[in-house]
Amino acid sequence: MRLISLLLPAVLWAVRLNGQIPDGPEPADTAGQTAYADTVNTPEGPAQKTAWKTSYFPYVSGAPNDGPLLAFRVHYFQPAEYENRVTANAAFTADAGITPRGGRQVTVRFRAPQLWKDWRVTSLAAAVREVRFGYFGIGNETVKDDNAVTPLQPFLYRVRRARYGGKIEVTHKLRGPLQAALLGFVEWTRFTTLPGPSLFKASFGPELKESDVSGRVALVYDTRDNEFNTHKGLLLEAGTQVGSGGDGYTRLYTVLRGYLPLREGTVAAARLVASGMGGDPTLNARFYLPAWENQIPILGGPYSHRSFDTIRFAGKHVLLGNVEVRHDLLPFGDLGAVTLLAFLDAGRVFEQENFKITTNGVKVGGGGGVAVRVLRSSIFTFNFAGGPDGFNFSVGSGWAF
């Protein structure tokens, strides 16, 4: 009880910081608990939709290798009914931030998961500059040697990356939990090297510019009980992508996710990712999988393989599996929870060989962690993992999957 008495004020204080850390690479829109009090039931008809609300606040988040991100957010949203699968019918979100090392970003998002019957829309426009982006080479056998990083070559595994672009995705409900999604995406990317020797400079020279216009169509089967803190159900998708980057490329992929409650407050979750590319994709296209309403960084980091640095491995094809158990150690009901995590991640990439289902060359790692859930609005995860590269600590906003 003493531990609970110490943690409860911290959770209540965190409510004041509601939404200050984005939920993963492309955050879902969330609303605080108080937003739901505005729903009005009238004798003349069914419950009315709540009014649109505005919130704005500064926050501190993480930027891989760039240090803390100091940012400001404006969030304009329409809260959903409390019992709904999502927390907002629709939301506009604008963020701007900088890092002490010179990184900066501006993003504008619009998400409407249930503003229109049987339709969902998401869109994003962004300009992001990362000054310590990690580059470790292409392929499954790349080596990361921390001893090789010295004062004479401090940026051996680092490169600057600037990305400008946007996307729009429209999803239509076909029948029951089956949906079809169409994504359009455009991006310009520029890599520039930092002072001294680097693996990137040895591979591509001092600068690499890329542009890419792509389209993706996917079928999605979604039976989750809710989208912000899933306890049971399936989220299955399969799709194909065509892109203009490089000399043109294609991609086939599938992402299969399942969630099973083991007991009150305990959930087992699993994910299988398989993707294969043809043609000549850009370097940046190898770094991400355009999954439904979100990207999956490939391969490494808190949203793919937690025992490795973000995008530790890159290749034309990828095979990834994740299993984890989430147990609410300190549940506070609607206020949130402190959750323990145990996970196992395994995966590999393919570059000079065809994709295949295999255990050869698969990188296996695992560990545990702690997650803090604040109301229905934010989930922060702290992961402690071990694998082929040794110990790795990562922080995520939202569940890994």
Where are each of the predicted segments found?
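Outer-membrane beta-barrel initiation region
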Residues: 20-123, 127, 179-183, 191-198, ...
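Transmembrane beta-barrel strands of outer-membrane/channel proteins
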Residues: 58-62, 72, 92-98, 121-131, ...
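Residues on the lipid-exposed face of transmembrane beta-strands in outer-membrane beta-barrel proteins
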Residues: 58-60, 72-76, 108-112, 166-172, ...
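Extracellular loop and loop/strand-boundary signature of outer-membrane beta-barrel proteins
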Residues: 93-95, 151-156, 200-206, 239-244, ...
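Outer-membrane beta-barrel translocator/channel fold
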Residues: 97, 101-166, 270-314, 380, ...
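Outer-membrane beta-barrel transmembrane strands
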Residues: 106-112, 152-188, 226-234, 246-248, ...
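Flexible, surface-exposed loop regions and adjacent strand-edge segments
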Residues: 128, 138-145, 197-203, 255, ...
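C-terminal outer-membrane beta-barrel translocator/porin domains of Gram-negative envelope proteins
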Residues: 208, 215-335
